[in-house]
């Protein structure tokens, strides 16, 4: 069939149908979303849960969500800006921080559902493949599916660090090792030690050492926040180990008391009826006093 020119006449515009708003804005991949939210018809009102992972310039958002007609509902959420309360105050968007955020979400969700004692996950971080096994007498493991949005799923991407943290935290997420750091596409082999180094931020530590040797000014400029907190390359692994232990000990978010800000009034308050009448009576009395004193002609 040859090339057919599209004739944009009255019939064309009359039948034209615009795409969904979020597709027009380039925010949602509906091809992937349809498959992520479509549940088996014999499961009726059982929602299909998604592990939603999104990255911004300064934060990581991890949510467990499910779809409804009126919109998505968030069951639980964890953010990288919560990590400072567990000791991680810098590098809140790297692979190690993504792992911590995923772990925090998993522990927070299981604690919310009362499953945190049954499904502890993997307490020893080795970087190897780990899958949650359901207990014999009790509820099954919480199953959800990774939702990466519009991110590129390249090998070693941070989104898989968040997923690995959630899996080690006790969530049941179908996955393989093909996209973790340490997987070699040519030999088809997975090096768990490389993955472990990324989880504990050793790739950052190696770069810190390299930059400190090559260019001291660039090192001080790029890692100024690390230097301010007294962190060097040797202290990074211990930092993340303590963070993992602290997250497991208490995943609940600390509630900060809101400061009371007294509301300012920029206009004068309206007088009551009694105040207005009193003001008029005082003015009359003052005027009569002046007349009696002969001050007014």
Curated annotation (Swiss-Prot):
CDD domains per record: Ribosomal_L18_L5e
Any Gene Ontology biological process: translation
Keyword list, A-Z: Cytoplasm, Nucleus, Ribonucleoprotein, Ribosomal protein, RNA-binding, rRNA-binding
InterPro entries: Rbsml_uL18_euk, Ribosomal_uL18_C_euk
Compartment(s) where it occurs, according to its Swiss-Prot or TrEMBL record: Cytoplasm; Nucleus
Top-level taxonomic group: Eukaryota
Pfam family, any one: Ribosomal_L18_c
Chief place of localization: cytoplasm
Basic and acidic residues bias: start-end ranges: 268-277
Positions of region (Disordered): 258-277
SUPFAM superfamilies to which the protein is assigned, alphabetical: Translational machinery components (SSF53137)
GO MF term (any one): structural constituent of ribosome
Similarity annotation: Belongs to the universal ribosomal protein uL18 family.
PANTHER family hit by this protein: LARGE RIBOSOMAL SUBUNIT PROTEIN UL18, RIBOSOMAL PROTEIN L5-RELATED
Function, in words: Component of the ribosome, a large ribonucleoprotein complex responsible for the synthesis of proteins in the cell. The small ribosomal subunit (SSU) binds messenger RNAs (mRNAs) and translates the encoded message by selecting cognate aminoacyl-transfer RNA (tRNA) molecules. The large subunit (LSU) contains the ribosomal catalytic site termed the peptidyl transferase center (PTC), which catalyzes the formation of peptide bonds, thereby polymerizing the amino acids delivered by tRNAs into a polypeptide chain.
Subunit and partners: Component of the large ribosomal subunit (LSU).
Protein name in UniProt: Large ribosomal subunit protein uL18
Species, as recorded: Helianthus annuus (Common sunflower)
Encoding gene, per UniProt annotation: RPL5A
